[in-house]
Amino acid sequence: MTDRIVPATLVFREDGTVVSPLYGDIYHSAAGALAQADHVFIRGNGLPERWRHERAFTIIETGFGTGCNFLATWAAWRADPSHCERLHFVSVEKHPFAREDLRRAAAHIVAYTTITTITPIAPLVDELANAWPALTPGVHRLEFDDGRVTLTLVFGDALDVLPNLALRAHAFYLDGFAPSKNADLWSPAIFKSLAKLADERATFATYTSSGAVKRALDEAGFAYRKVDGFAGKRAMLVGEFAPRWRVRRHEPPRAFSTDRRDAIVIGAGLAGCAVVERLAARGWHVTLIERRERIASEASGNPAGVFHPMIARDDNLAARLSRAGFLHALHRWRALERAGHAFSRSTHGLVQLATSDDEFERMRESIDALGVPAELASALSRDDARALLRTDVAHGGWLFAQGGSISPATLAAAQCAAAGDRLSRIVGVEIARLERGGDGRWRALDASGATIAQASVVVVANAADAARIAGLRHAPTQRVRGQLTLLPPGSAPAVPLPVIGDGYVVPLANGVTLTGATYEPDDTDATPREAGHRENLERLERLLPAFSANALDAGALAGRVGFRCVASDRLPLVGELGDEAAAAREAAALTGARLRDVPRATGLYGAFGYGSRGLVWAALGAELIAAQIDGEPWPLERELAEAIDPARFLVRALRHGRVA
């Protein structure tokens, strides 16, 4: 991948401490990892007292290691009856442990702890290990205690990933290996990156008191002081963010300011229902408005859709976004299922077949070169694909062990059910435009000008109509017709799991097979056509040679038409919308603007342009919007968030002098 992850090696010393052979240093003191975490990092940052005054509290750690600092902090949060509503723990790790090594290391440390905690920590170890993500570069968000404790893991070199984070930190745990063993993690560049993320009242703590670290802290705007170290160590450092000069051009993100936590979501498809669930989980009261009589009636009403990540040899933006979206969606869906909100999905994997032998070689070489873990994707020879699919195939491909198919409508229903009584629905009503009143609240108006609903926040998630309703001129999207075909039982090879390539085939209940889909830009015909069925049959024949397209009467087949919303750069539009009117007034000053310089339509967000990847992108997009609204750490790198920022087209227009 961008920089493949090299896992840590688990080694125990005779005294029971965990040691890194790579750095030649221990992960924790022989006097006890949990006691060290409590003394140095929790107490060193004035916790738990400080988080009692915040709705949400964010901690950044440099070096996740065995996870003991997180486990100790989580246990302290659980034990505090006055704890903050939501605890965010963000940790950067260049060499994460594999799942079972992490479980062994943390369990060993807990078993030999020298302190007694109110909250048992051993069960937390299992929860952490069970949720542990695939070792792929980037951001991985895990949730515990019904989402009230969030662990955001960032796998990669801190020098590279810290400047790419978007969050506001209240406390820093500086916990790399000793400066003499891993100087990069204590360099001035690290502290300058942390300073750009610090809240005005942020604190830090670290076990070291080296002169180089003190100088780097001072240069970055942190005031430090020495205090007694842990287990007889003479000194450690604690302190506050207290810059004597301006150290950053842009302030870190803040929560949307409002006295009323209510929101409107327009569009009840995959995008909108995912946003509903994420906002409701944070205590927002949401009004969902859908122009049809029921949710998931348009493209999200297809019998099934496939979900899998993209893999590209250059690990481009689209591939990274799809990987992040895929892994995040799996995490969210499992959480829904654990909460009793079931929906229909296959869990036996998905196969992507090459269209030629040369393409198969490129596919195989890609996952080898990128170091893709087998739990994400593995190469599948032609013979292996034949055996797995129980039918002939022309070429090998990839097996996505966690990919599959899903019923979008059942997922949307589960997300709405999870929102519970925080959700109100208005169906059969079409919104014509949005208007922000003098009180700062948004109103959703119908064609007659009547107010259908009002709220502090609005999220437009109604595909190709979103830009029109939000009044956007610089959000180029296109409607693309897609026709799928339903094949009767016994008329197609009975593959046991979804297959994609040039088209797709999905086994449904009762022996019915779904195949498709056509791709017809700017075609608005919602009626299935014989020509579309014929195209799908021919595509299926190329995918599975045992099938004959001529064996069926295309004119007698059933099917369905949906419309994708596709942006001109094929990436979705997710996040706070730009204020185009304000940008026009300031156009002369914004010709060289970056996305963070663009004026925003306060309280107005978008989640649209997902194309054919709504299942992969909707959950991550919803989490990003909820995080932006509540001022939480973003669930993906800033570079990726900017790639899908709805205002990116406005910035391009400003640079070319096309905004007036």
Curated annotation (Swiss-Prot):
GO terms of biological process kind: methylation; tRNA wobble base modification
Region feature (FAD-dependent cmnm(5)s(2)U34 oxidoreductase): 266-660
Keyword Chloroplast part of the UniProt annotation: no
Positions of the UniProt region annotated as tRNA (mnm(5)s(2)U34)-methyltransferase: 1-242
Principal location: cytoplasm
Cofactor: FAD
Keyword Transferase carried by entry: yes
Protein name: tRNA 5-methylaminomethyl-2-thiouridine biosynthesis bifunctional protein MnmC
Molecular function GO terms recorded: flavin adenine dinucleotide binding; oxidoreductase activity, acting on the CH-NH group of donors; tRNA (5-methylaminomethyl-2-thiouridylate)(34)-methyltransferase activity
Natural source organism: Burkholderia mallei (strain ATCC 23344)
